[in-house]
């Protein structure tokens, strides 16, 4: 079972997501974030489920349509660990620029 580590910047991603949901008066915003966290837990048992992207990273698609999100992560099989680097809405273009991305 792979260990899951969240980058410190993930807190900023959740803040951005919650602020967006609040600005659109979305009910159950906390449940949406809980759904994202629940989806990330899938990576414990299946770390290669995400689609491959550049630089040995992968993307996990979470949810669907206007409620969907994408988690950028890297799996390191040598230590059986998943490092979640960023989370964004499926409607956002790209990820925030971060100096610490591995």
Model-flagged regions — what are they?
Residues 21, 64-102:
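Enriched for short, Lys/Arg-rich terminal
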Residues 1-59, 64, 78, 101-102:
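Basic, Lys/Arg-enriched alpha-helical interface segments
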């Amino acid at each position: 079972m792979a260990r899951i580590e969240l980058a410190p910047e993930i807190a900023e991603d959740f803040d951005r997501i919650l602020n967006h949901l609040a600005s659109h008066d979305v009910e159950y915003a906390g449940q949406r974030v809980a759904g994202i966290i629940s989806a990330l837990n899938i990576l414990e048992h299946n770390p290669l489920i995400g689609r491959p992207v550049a630089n040995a990273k992968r993307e996990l698609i979470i949810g669907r349509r206007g409620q969907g999100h994408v988690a950028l992560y890297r799996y390191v099989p040598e230590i059986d660990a998943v490092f979640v680097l960023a989370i964004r809405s499926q409607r956002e273009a790209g990820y925030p620029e971060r100096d610490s991305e591995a």
